[in-house]
UniProtKB/Swiss-Prot annotation:
Name of this protein: Release factor glutamine methyltransferase
CDD domains the record matches: AdoMet_MTases (cd02440)
Binding locations of S-adenosyl-L-methionine: 130-134, 153, 182, 196
GO MF: nucleic acid binding; protein-(glutamine-N5) methyltransferase activity; protein-glutamine N-methyltransferase activity
First-tier enzyme category under EC: transferase
Gene3D superfamilies assigned: DNA helicase RuvA subunit, C-terminal domain, Vaccinia Virus protein VP39
Native species: Agrobacterium fabrum (strain C58 / ATCC 33970) (Agrobacterium tumefaciens (strain C58))
Record lineage: Bacteria, Pseudomonadati, Pseudomonadota, Alphaproteobacteria, Hyphomicrobiales
Function summary: Methylates the class 1 translation termination release factors RF1/PrfA and RF2/PrfB on the glutamine residue of the universally conserved GGQ motif.
Catalysed conversion reaction: L-glutaminyl-[peptide chain release factor] + S-adenosyl-L-methionine = N(5)-methyl-L-glutaminyl-[peptide chain release factor] + S-adenosyl-L-homocysteine + H(+)
Disulfide-linked positions: none
Family: Belongs to the protein N5-glutamine methyltransferase family. PrmC subfamily.
Entry EC number(s): 2.1.1.297
Pfam families: MTS, PrmC_N
Keywords from the named record: Methyltransferase, S-adenosyl-L-methionine, Transferase
Length: 289
């Protein structure tokens, strides 16, 4: 990557940052460090303490290939094949949405209800609809050892990835996957039903940032003509699968709070909480009936 005869981490970092900056990448230094660290095993401290550490020809070639993919618009965590979420290291795959930091707000909002259920009964069950990587359910399980969960998804690829993520994070004994179109194959009752469904209007999807629309699965983005179709399905059936005083939690688009609240209200649910994300946008709603 560096083009010099004696490649060092410092030289690789300078060259990688320059290439990404020229390509218009928003955080060229951050992304360059992440990709180089993946190849070399460096920590952030190592970049400061060991800048002259030698890089082999093979490592340099791998770094160059990854930097080029990033320069061409592939998201850095897609290149790495994994991403941190709520303290978990999660694998990504073709048919999984890349977990975003704002979705951690959904996890944190539901934790008190989950722990309350455990304190009352000694255990609790979670259903994560459209589980993808398993991020939401697994993060809740990590924080509550007495809980168990089911991740459902229509995608076999996503379910395989979620199962791998459960195993790599030591949560597989309390997590199972079911291939289901929403509630179609679900049975039993749950203390928490949670979902980060596709909520972007069909006509908006084509205008999304290329890093999103070209690399996240369309099925995880497109929420139908008005972006509300998944919420109608969830609200219509969730009551049949909730225990008494169970909680439904959903992630929403920044402008959907009133519409989604009205949909759930029409099915007898009361709004418990409306929470904003780190950017100050409406992002999470919880309901009970």
């Amino acid at each position: 990557m560096s083009g010099g005869g004696d490649a060092t981490v410092s030289a690789e970092l300078i060259a990688a940052r320059k290439r990404l900056q020229a390509a218009g990448v928003a955080d060229p230094l951050v992304d360059a460090r992440l990709l180089i660290a993946d190849v070399t095993g460096f920590s952030l401290t190592d970049f400061v303490m060991k800048p002259e550490h030698p890089v082999t020809q093979d490592e340099s070639a791998r770094i160059a290939a990854m930097i080029e993919r990033r320069a061409e618009g592939e998201p850095v965590h897609r290149i790495l094949g994994h991403r941190e979420f709520h303290g978990l290291d999660l694998l990504l795959s073709k048919e999984t949405l890349e977990p975003r930091p704002d979705t951690e707000v959904l996890v944190d909002t539901l934790l008190p209800a989950l722990k309350e259920a455990v304190s009352r009964k000694g255990s609790a069950r979670i259903l994560d609809l459209g589980t993808g990587t398993g991020a939401i359910c697994l993060a809740l399980l990590k924080e509550c050892a007495q809980a168990s969960g089911i991740g459902s998804d229509i995608s076999a690829d996503a379910l395989e990835t979620a199962a791998k993520n459960a195993a790599r994070n030591g949560l597989d004994s309390r997590f199972e996957t079911i291939r289901s179109n929403w509630f179609e194959k679900i049975s039993g009752r749950f203390d928490i039903i949670v979902s980060n469904p596709p909520y972007i209007r069909t006509d908006i999807v084509a205008t999304l940032d290329p890093e999103v629309r070209n690399h996240d699965p369309m099925a995880a983005l497109d929420g139908g003509q008005d972006g509300l179709a998944p919420y109608r399905l969830i609200a219509a059936d969730a009551g049949r699968f909730l225990v008494e005083n169970g909680t439904v939690g959903v992630e929403i688009g920044f402008d959907q709070r009133l519409d989604v609240s009205a949909i759930f209200a029409s099915h007898g649910f009361s709004l418990l909480d409306a929470v904003k994300d780190y950017g100050g946008n409406d992002r999470v709603l919880t309901f009970r009936r």
